[in-house]
């Protein structure tokens, strides 16, 4: 349109103060463009007569008139300072780069569009041809005619924008990003796409949506490692793994069940464990061997057994069944010489010992007598527990070696080894006729019971406990203690739920038979260390 004006006059007056120009003082590049791009010469000027900024001072007529043609102004735009690197010269590298980028964008856009041909006779075709001719005539000589020119205002704004942005915000936007941001009508919209940077340099990531069909990776757990060896060494009674030297874990030679020496009933002796060829069977294995009936009826010749196999079989049988086999063989073959020449003498000695033992059982015994008798009876019971088929009137010889290994301590030895703090304090206070200080009590206990290693704090708690029970008297200052010799054994306790019968003889308290063999009439309740214990009297 050669006759169209560059600015259409709207007929109104122009006011510089109220002009809504977007590049005002808040623009980020105040050094390249003047804050006020347009200013009116007089109050009666309209928008068709304006002054251009310093970048466009090369135009001959600074006032763009509506009657002037646009191409005449562009012809003289680049003439002054043609060879210099001024802002208005096309020799400037930034301007050349901007024109080259616009050319590439125009070429890519044309290649993506479908081919379109217009009829030469149509009016639209003629109109576009005239507009293109005017645009080509307005291009500078060093710009190709095939390129699509940009208006001078757009070129200036793009150059100023790129120069004014800081280096941290000047993010290179490639063709892909421009294609994502641009729209068909030329406007730029900002989308929150994954992996796309905004103009300020911030990365925008799209939130991940929950998909119930997607299986999340799970951590695979390996096979559990259990200490099989350690569990196999656990005592079957107390369920502990510790095996101290004085209470070792022993495995049964029959069922391979582990037991502590003190946990198994009866106690497992150290001599049996120290012997290289010793075998030990638990009580369950011995009971099963007892209950198994003895089956006979076949000879070793028929089974073709060797001497070692015969010995192994006979050792597996309990003693009672072996005695029965010997008696049965004697009945079949009385001429077998398996008796000792001193058999009658041995039997008489055993009978005399047994009669003496049964005579003393009906007499009242003291602590020492009970110890000696208990030593003999326990040894006899251990050596004859499997000989149930023997006559009851024939005593069995006592194993002297077993008696020495199972020696029962005396009362003093027992107090030093197994008594608690309350018993020790009572014994010490009983040895003093008058009240003594706390230091005297502790020194006496440390000297007499040095192997126990009793702490002073335990002695203090024991004294306080005995004072509450009225067994020990303490003075008003709390510095001396004395045994309460007037303690009434028949007086009931202060606590209504427990009755105290007082101290009982030490022989009865330490060495008593099993309570399940006695009735309730022969038992008495004794509170020791604030715990009721049922003790039986003889």
From Swiss-Prot:
Keywords: Chromatin regulator, Metal-binding, Nucleus, Transcription, Transcription regulation, Zinc, Zinc-finger. Residues 98-111 have a biased composition (Basic and acidic residues). A zinc finger (PHD-type) spans 232-288. Pfam families: PHD. Component of the SWM histone demethylase complex composed of at least lsd1, lsd2, phf1 and phf2. Residues 28-47, 98-150, 198-222, 367-396 are annotated as: Disordered. Component of the SWM histone demethylase complex that specifically demethylates H3K9me2, a specific tag for epigenetic transcriptional activation, thereby acting as a corepressor. Has a role in regulating heterochromatin propagation and euchromatic transcription. It is found in: Nucleus. CDD domains: PHD_Phf1p_Phf2p_like. GO terms for biological process: chromatin remodeling; heterochromatin boundary formation; negative regulation of gene expression, epigenetic; positive regulation of DNA-templated transcription. GO terms for cellular component: chromatin; Lsd1/2 complex; mating-type region heterochromatin; nucleus; pericentric heterochromatin; subtelomeric heterochromatin. It comes from the Eukaryota. Residues 367-392 have a biased composition (Polar residues). This is SWM histone demethylase complex subunit phf2. Disulfide bonds: none annotated. The keyword Zinc-finger applies. Signal peptide: none annotated.
């Amino acid at each position: 349109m050669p006759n169209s004006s560059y600015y259409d006059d709207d007929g109104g007056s122009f006011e510089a103060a109220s002009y809504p120009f977007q590049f005002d003082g808040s623009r980020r590049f105040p050094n390249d463009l003047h804050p006020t791009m347009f200013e009116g010469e007089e109050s009666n000027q309209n928008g068709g007569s304006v002054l251009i900024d310093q970048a466009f001072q090369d135009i001959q007529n600074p006032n763009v008139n509506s009657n002037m043609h646009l191409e005449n102004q562009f012809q003289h735009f680049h003439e002054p300072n043609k060879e210099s690197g001024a802002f208005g010269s096309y020799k400037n590298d930034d301007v050349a780069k901007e024109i080259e980028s616009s050319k590439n964008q125009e070429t890519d856009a044309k290649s993506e569009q479908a081919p379109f041909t217009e009829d030469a006779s149509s009016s639209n075709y003629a109109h576009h041809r005239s507009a293109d001719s005017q645009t080509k005539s307005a291009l500078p000589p060093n710009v190709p005619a095939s390129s699509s020119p940009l208006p001078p205002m757009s070129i200036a704004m793009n150059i100023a924008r790129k120069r004014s942005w800081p280096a941290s915000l000047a993010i290179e936007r490639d063709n892909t990003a421009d294609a994502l941001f641009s729209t068909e009508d030329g406007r730029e919209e900002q989308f929150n796409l994954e992996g796309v940077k905004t103009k300020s340099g911030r990365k925008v990531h799209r939130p991940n949506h929950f998909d119930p069909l997607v299986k999340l990776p799970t951590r695979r757990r390996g096979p559990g490692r259990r200490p099989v060896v350690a569990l196999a060494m656990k005592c079957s009674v107390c369920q502990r793994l510790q095996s101290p030297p004085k209470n070792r874990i022993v495995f049964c030679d029959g069922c391979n069940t582990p037991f502590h020496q003190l946990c198994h009933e009866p106690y497992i002796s150290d001599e049996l464990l120290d012997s290289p060829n010793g075998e030990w069977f638990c009580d369950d294995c011995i009971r099963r061997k007892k209950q198994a009936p003895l089956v006979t009826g076949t000879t070793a010749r028929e089974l073709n057994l060797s001497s070692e196999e015969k010995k192994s079989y006979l050792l597996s049988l309990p003693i009672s069944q072996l005695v029965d086999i010997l008696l049965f063989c004697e009945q079949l073959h009385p001429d077998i010489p398996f008796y000792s020449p001193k058999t009658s003498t041995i039997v008489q000695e055993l009978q005399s010992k047994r009669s003496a033992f049964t005579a003393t059982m009906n007499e009242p015994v003291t602590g020492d007598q009970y110890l000696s008798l208990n030593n003999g009876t326990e040894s006899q019971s251990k050596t004859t527990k499997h000989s149930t088929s023997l006559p009851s009137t024939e005593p069995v010889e006592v194993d002297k070696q077993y008696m020495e290994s199972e020696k029962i301590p005396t009362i003093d030895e027992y107090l030093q080894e197994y008594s608690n703090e309350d018993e020790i304090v009572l014994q010490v206070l009983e040895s003093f006729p008058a009240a003594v200080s706390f230091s005297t009590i502790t020194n006496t206990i440390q000297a007499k019971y040095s192997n126990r290693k009793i702490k002073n704090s335990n002695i203090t708690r024991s004294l306080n406990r005995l004072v509450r029970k009225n067994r020990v008297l303490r003075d008003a200052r709390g510095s001396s203690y004395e045994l309460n010799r007037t303690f009434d054994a028949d007086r009931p306790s202060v606590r209504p739920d427990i009755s105290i019968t007082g101290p009982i003889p030490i022989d009865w308290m330490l060495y008593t038979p099993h309570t399940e063999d006695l009735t309730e009439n022969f038992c008495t309740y004794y509170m020791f260390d604030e715990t009721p214990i049922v003790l039986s009297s003889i």
